[in-house]
């Protein structure tokens, strides 16, 4: 299948605390993407600083790391055709106020500082983030019985 790729999706502490984990997983499954990695974890400050290294000079960096370290997160790897681009569309805009209804942030968020979910913004970012959060042996390669009903 052309353009079959993987993306990193993380449900942030506010999404976990609000009980939205199942709803978010449901949306990705119903779209037809395949879950190949999942962790429920308390991310270390070091991991978070490395994950957000591109934002280290921004004034909100320390607050972002503190927020992401404030509770458990759900780290996931999803696989499918154009999953990075489509996943970003499903998430909505970084600022929930700019997100359309029907997107995760458009349906469940109000403020940018509590936008419940992270998604890789490119295939290259996805590869980096997946390598940061998962060891290769933690990713499961399998064939879904639904695959022939989703892809031509």
Curated annotation (Swiss-Prot):
Crosslinked residue numbers (Glycyl lysine isopeptide (Lys-Gly) (interchain with G-Cter in ubiquitin)): 100
Cellular location(s): Cytoplasm; Nucleus
Reactions the enzyme catalyzes: a 2'-deoxyribonucleoside 5'-diphosphate + ATP = a 2'-deoxyribonucleoside 5'-triphosphate + ADP; a ribonucleoside 5'-diphosphate + ATP = a ribonucleoside 5'-triphosphate + ADP
Keyword flag Ubl conjugation: yes
GO biological process entries: cell differentiation; CTP biosynthetic process; endocytosis; GTP biosynthetic process; lactation; negative regulation of cell population proliferation; nervous system development; positive regulation of DNA binding
EC number: 2.7.4.6
Binding site for ATP: 12, 60, 88, 94, 105, 115
Activation and inhibition: Autophosphorylation at His-118 increases serine/threonine protein kinase activity of the enzyme. Interaction with the SET complex inhibits the endonuclease activity.
Cofactor(s) required, per the database record: Mg(2+)
Function of the molecule: Major role in the synthesis of nucleoside triphosphates other than ATP. The ATP gamma phosphate is transferred to the NDP beta phosphate via a ping-pong mechanism, using a phosphorylated active-site intermediate. Possesses nucleoside-diphosphate kinase, serine/threonine-specific protein kinase, geranyl and farnesyl pyrophosphate kinase, histidine protein kinase and 3'-5' exonuclease activities. Involved in cell proliferation, differentiation and development, signal transduction, G protein-coupled receptor endocytosis, and gene expression.
Protein name, per record: Nucleoside diphosphate kinase A
Native source species: Homo sapiens
């Amino acid at each position: 299948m052309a353009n079959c790729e993987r993306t990193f999706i993380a449900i942030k502490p506010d999404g976990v605390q609000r009980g939205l984990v199942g709803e978010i997983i449901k949306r990705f499954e119903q779209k037809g993407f395949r879950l190949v990695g999942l962790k429920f974890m308390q991310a270390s400050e070091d991991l978070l600083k490395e994950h957000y290294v591109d934002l280290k000079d921004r004034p909100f960096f320390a607050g972002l790391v503190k927020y992401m370290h404030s509770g458990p997160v759900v780290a996931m790897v999803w696989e499918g055709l154009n999953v990075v681009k489509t996943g970003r569309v499903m998430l909505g805009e970084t600022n929930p106020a700019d997100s359309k209804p029907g997107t995760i942030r458009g349906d469940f968020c109000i403020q940018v500082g509590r936008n419940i979910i992270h998604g890789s913004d490119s295939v290259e970012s996805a590869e980096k983030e997946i390598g940061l959060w998962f060891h290769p042996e933690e990713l499961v390669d399998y064939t879904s019985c639904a695959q022939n009903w989703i892809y031509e």
